[in-house]
Regions:
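A short acidic, Gly/Pro-enriched loop at the edge of an enzyme's catalytic core
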Residues: 94-101
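SAM-dependent methyltransferase
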Residues: 136-204
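C-terminal lobe and adjacent flexible extensions of AdoMet/dcAdoMet transferase-like proteins
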Residues: 200-237
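Class I SAM-dependent methyltransferase SAM/SAH-binding core
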Residues: 43, 50-92
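Conserved class I S-adenosyl-L-methionine
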Residues: 1-38
Length: 237
């Protein structure tokens, strides 16, 4: 797992990728009371620009965040000045306090190729999650990820951004982002992810002690199927 460049963080924030945490946050705030659960605080792993933290804090859940990319955390601190944000590696991260709710969205777990490292993340989360607390995250669905046609858009009179997702291997995904200034390539970044077997992920959770584990293509029954699996797990009381 590698930190995003500052240029990519800026493109991410300006392009509109914040829509995903916005939709997820709205659904999460409906999902929580259906579990009879009212968390007082939350930690968002791989929080990106802090949008989910802002939504949770708007619902009086004291949400903090962490991300590997300094550029993402700089934007998160601007978006949520009252929150606490750390620049850290999710594999080894220990926040130094306990939380009722832990989230990890935007298929961040797919950025971790080794299942042994995923297991370490789950072990750490179990340790700083309060008894009875929930861990809610997502992973990409194999059937929903395929080679795509390039997509591009003008972000200013002189700048154009180009995207393409490809499957270079059976369980591999690559997202290529290019930025052109006045028609000349000025930046390129490739984001590589690994498609994980959801059953294997659920077994890892169980191995760490989590219970009430669910895996579904929709967080709410009434919402349409997503391109990700939503996985929820609870720490025993």
């Amino acid at each position: 797992m590698h930190p995003y460049s500052d240029i990519f963080c800026k493109v991410y924030n300006e392009f509109g990728w914040n829509y995903y945490p916005e939709i997820f946050g709205e659904q999460l705030l409906q999902w929580l009371p259906r579990q009879g659960f009212a968390p007082k605080n939350a930690m968002d792993l791989a929080c990106g620009t802090g949008i989910l933290c802002r939504i949770l804090r708007g619902a009086e859940i004291a949400a903090d965040g962490m991300d590997l990319s300094q550029g993402m955390i700089a934007i998160a601190r601007e978006n949520v000045p009252e929150g606490h944000f750390d620049v850290a590696d999710m594999i080894t991260y220990l926040p130094g306090k306990q939380y009722d709710l832990v989230t990890c969205t935007g298929d961040a777990v797919n950025h971790i190729p080794a299942l042994s490292d995923v297991a370490q993340i789950f072990r750490n989360v179990y340790g700083f999650l309060n008894p009875g607390g929930y861990f809610v995250f997502d992973i990409l669905r194999h059937s929903e990820v395929s080679d795509s046609e390039p997509f591009e858009m003008d972000t200013s009179p002189t700048q154009r951004v180009w995207f393409q997702m490809t499957r270079p291997g059976e369980n591999k995904v690559n997202l290529c982002i290019r930025v052109y200034e006045q028609g000349t390539l000025s930046f390129e970044e490739n984001i590589r992810e690994t498609l994980h077997d959801p059953e294997a992920i659920c077994r890892l959770l169980e191995d760490q002690g989590f219970r009430n584990i669910t895996c579904t293509d929709r967080l709410l029954p009434e919402s349409g199927p997503a391109t990700t699996w939503f996985i929820t797990a609870q720490k025993a009381q």
